[in-house]
């Protein structure tokens, strides 16, 4: 176990930071909520900016690795998934047989998702729940899969959210997380840092009139645990068969784990 793992994976750490700014633990959730209320209508544009448009390919890879079955009794919980982007991809991959529950703490994000579900004819297959990832309002062993994309780094107490994920999964259930990660190629890292810290906040100001929100999102990526450290956190929460796949030079990573 590395010192970084000990700091973040066991004792916590991100609950005391808002990007690179140190804050009181009680402030974190409300500050993150403010960011996502402000970017909800432009969320896909935000991910396009943060990922150079690659998030769509990464999300397709996530759903392909999940490989949802075309079964009406198969249930997925998509956490921090308010706009429905991941849930809708999963439902379409299941030939519109599965059922998705989209959970988000942010009402503005959920509002966008509900409109999209109606527009795409997926409302009958989708429930939207406003709740906290750290305190899921579901019984034990309720879901076959738990997904979260670009959301776990915004949860104040990540370890608690992982314990809740483990609790609500059925035995044999799958955890799958897509998150920005620690770039492993030196040249790419320099280019991505230049893009992240010097270009993205300016684009955020121009496109969404909110450079500060985009600056937080960039900084939160840098504060998130490295791939191996996050794997340790999943093991610590009780998961087995933990693994990850780096995407595009590790700009992002897909983390997989099972409840055995």
Curated annotation (Swiss-Prot):
Keywords: Menaquinone biosynthesis, Methyltransferase, S-adenosyl-L-methionine, Transferase, Ubiquinone biosynthesis
CDD domains: AdoMet_MTases
Superkingdom of source: Bacteria
EC numbers: 2.1.1.163, 2.1.1.201
Molecular functions per Gene Ontology: 2-methoxy-6-polyprenyl-1,4-benzoquinol methyltransferase activity; demethylmenaquinone methyltransferase activity
Pathway participation: Quinol/quinone metabolism; menaquinone biosynthesis; menaquinol from 1,4-dihydroxy-2-naphthoate: step 2/2; Cofactor biosynthesis; ubiquinone biosynthesis
Listed GO biological process terms: aerobic respiration; menaquinone biosynthetic process; methylation
Pfam families, sorted: Ubie_methyltran
Catalyzed reactions: a 2-demethylmenaquinol + S-adenosyl-L-methionine = a menaquinol + S-adenosyl-L-homocysteine + H(+); a 2-methoxy-6-(all-trans-polyprenyl)benzene-1,4-diol + S-adenosyl-L-methionine = a 5-methoxy-2-methyl-3-(all-trans-polyprenyl)benzene-1,4-diol + S-adenosyl-L-homocysteine + H(+)
PROSITE patterns: SAM_MT_UBIE, UBIE_1, UBIE_2
Entry binding sites for S-adenosyl-L-methionine: 83, 104, 132-133
Function of the molecule: Methyltransferase required for the conversion of demethylmenaquinol (DMKH2) to menaquinol (MKH2) and the conversion of 2-polyprenyl-6-methoxy-1,4-benzoquinol (DDMQH2) to 2-polyprenyl-3-methyl-6-methoxy-1,4-benzoquinol (DMQH2).
HAMAP family to which the protein is assigned, alphabetical: MenG_UbiE_methyltr
PANTHER family cross-referenced by the UniProt entry: 2-METHOXY-6-POLYPRENYL-1,4-BENZOQUINOL METHYLASE, MITOCHONDRIAL (PTHR43591:SF24), METHYLTRANSFERASE (PTHR43591)
Family: Belongs to the class I-like SAM-binding methyltransferase superfamily. MenG/UbiE family.
Protein known as: Ubiquinone/menaquinone biosynthesis C-methyltransferase UbiE
Organism field: Bartonella quintana (strain Toulouse)
Name of the gene this protein is made from: ubiE
